[in-house]
UniProtKB/Swiss-Prot annotation:
Lineage: Bacteria, Pseudomonadati, Pseudomonadota, Betaproteobacteria, Burkholderiales
GO cellular component: cytoplasm
Residues bound to Zn(2+): H118, H122, H128
Subcellular location: Cytoplasm
Gene: ybeY
Protein name per Swiss-Prot or TrEMBL: Endoribonuclease YbeY
Organism of derivation: Bordetella parapertussis (strain 12822 / ATCC BAA-587 / NCTC 13253)
InterPro entries: MetalPrtase_cat_dom_sf_prd, YbeY, YbeY_CS
Broad EC category: hydrolase
Transmembrane stretches, start-end: none
Note describing how the cofactor binds: Binds 1 zinc ion.
Similarity remark: Belongs to the endoribonuclease YbeY family.
Length: 157
């Protein structure tokens, strides 16, 4: 059974290449991957996904992480409640995403899919602070992206 998803998408900056339906599909792929990786008991996810510009991305990163620059993706994990629903917010900085895609010689859509999957997994409690956690999270991201026809993002271009 598919994990129930409530997704609120907000556009601080518009990008026609990133419509709601596409972002939703990427989040659903991440949820399905997590369900196959031990999150089978997850009843659902209530997530916010906001696309922002450099100024907002920098402000949020400074305010919540103490780092005075815009980063590619920020995730605010609120945990899974007794109802089995994971809650969180994901913020993707579109100009940083676009710059990284160019630098890494990836398509904008492939990199956007990766950052969306990455942020969704963080919202479900995955992390990459410790080496073992990082290997698990990166392996799951790679599997999820492969299901979407996207190459391993951790291989050099």
């Amino acid at each position: 059974m598919a994990t129930e998803l409530s997704l609120s998408v907000q556009y601080g900056v518009a990008d026609a290449r990133l419509p709601r339906w596409r972002l939703r599909r990427w989040v659903q792929y991440a949820l399905a991957g997590a369900a196959g990786d031990g999150h089978a008991g997850l009843a659902g996810a209530e997530l916010g996904l906001r696309l922002v510009g450099l100024a907002e991305g920098r402000r949020l990163n400074r305010e919540f992480r103490g780092r005075d620059y815009a980063t590619n993706v920020l995730t605010f994990e609120y945990g899974t409640g007794p109802d089995g629903v994971a809650r969180g917010d994901i913020v993707v900085c579109v100009p940083v995403l676009a710059r990284e895609a160019r630098e890494q010689r990836k398509t904008l859509l492939d990199h956007a899919a990766h950052l969306t999957v990455h942020g969704t997994l963080h919202a479900l409690g995955y992390d990459h602070i410790k080496a073992g956690e990082a290997r698990r999270m990166e392996a799951l991201e790679t599997v999820v992206l492969a299901r979407m026809g996207i190459a391993d993002p951790y291989l050099a271009a």
